[in-house]
């Protein structure tokens, strides 16, 4: 849950900055957002596989990220492709919930929280 709060905070703080630079398609922080998108996709698959019964929670977080970014069509597609890449790569790797899958979720939640925190930090 901490990851979700940090992610939502990061997205809220990024929205005004994005609105100012709406004419530019690529943002300096897009690499981090693309990685976060990939993590959200992987976590969506793995948590569902491991019976978390969260429904579409992680997909909704991805939709919130894209919405908060007010992304152009090209950026939106890149974010969605990253989400799908994360989802598909772990769908190919895991057919059942294993200890390794659960450990990967923990690693992803940690990395995602770190990315969200870095994205939320004001830049000088």
Stretches found by the model and what they are:
Residues 1-8:
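Bacterial N-terminal signal peptides that target proteins for export
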Residues 16-18:
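N-terminal signal peptide c-region/cleavage motif recognized by signal peptidases
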Residues 5, 44, 86:
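Functionally constrained cores in energy, signaling, and assembly domains
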Residues 54-124:
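Compact alpha-helical subdomains of small soluble proteins
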Residues 21-52:
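Immediate post-signal-peptide N-terminus of mature secreted/exported proteins
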């Amino acid at each position: 849950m901490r990851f979700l709060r940090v992610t939502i905070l990061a997205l809220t703080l990024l929205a005004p900055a994005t609105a100012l630079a709406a004419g530019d398609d690529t943002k300096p922080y897009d690499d981090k957002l693309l990685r976060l998108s990939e993590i959200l996709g992987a976590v969506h698959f793995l948590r569902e596989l491991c019976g978390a019964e969260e429904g579409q929670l992680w997909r909704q977080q991805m939709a919130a990220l894209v919405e908060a970014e007010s992304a152009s069509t090209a950026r939106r597609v890149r974010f969605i492709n990253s989400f799908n890449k994360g989802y598909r790569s772990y769908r190919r790797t895991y057919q059942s919930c294993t200890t390794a899958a659960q450990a990967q979720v923990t690693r992803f939640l940690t990395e995602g929280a770190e990315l969200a925190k870095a994205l939320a930090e004001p830049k000088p």
